[in-house]
From Swiss-Prot:
It is found in: Secreted. This is Fibrinogen beta chain. GO terms for cellular component: extracellular region. The modification Pyrrolidone carboxylic acid is found at Q1. It comes from Muntiacus muntjak. The keyword Coiled coil applies. The modification Sulfotyrosine is found at Y6. Heterohexamer; disulfide linked. Contains 2 sets of 3 non-identical chains (alpha, beta and gamma). The 2 heterotrimers are in head to head conformation with the N-termini in a small central domain. Cleaved by the protease thrombin to yield monomers which, together with fibrinogen alpha (FGA) and fibrinogen gamma (FGG), polymerize to form an insoluble fibrin matrix. Fibrin has a major function in hemostasis as one of the primary components of blood clots. In addition, functions during the early stages of wound repair to stabilize the lesion and guide cell migration during re-epithelialization. Was originally thought to be essential for platelet aggregation, based on in vitro studies using anticoagulated blood. Residues 1-11 have a biased composition (Acidic residues). Residues 12-21 have a biased composition (Basic and acidic residues). Conversion of fibrinogen to fibrin is triggered by thrombin, which cleaves fibrinopeptides A and B from alpha and beta chains, and thus exposes the N-terminal polymerization sites responsible for the formation of the soft clot. A long coiled coil structure formed by 3 polypeptide chains connects the central nodule to the C-terminal domains (distal nodules). The long C-terminal ends of the alpha chains fold back, contributing a fourth strand to the coiled coil structure. Residues 1-21 are annotated as: Disordered.
Length: 21
């Protein structure tokens, strides 16, 4: 499992994207 800030940011963005929808 990769635990990097970039991965976390990407996940956050994906969640925001779904929320924005």
């Amino acid at each position: 499992q990769h635990s990097t800030d970039y991965d976390e940011v990407e996940d956050d963005r994906a969640k925001l994207h779904l929320d924005a929808r």
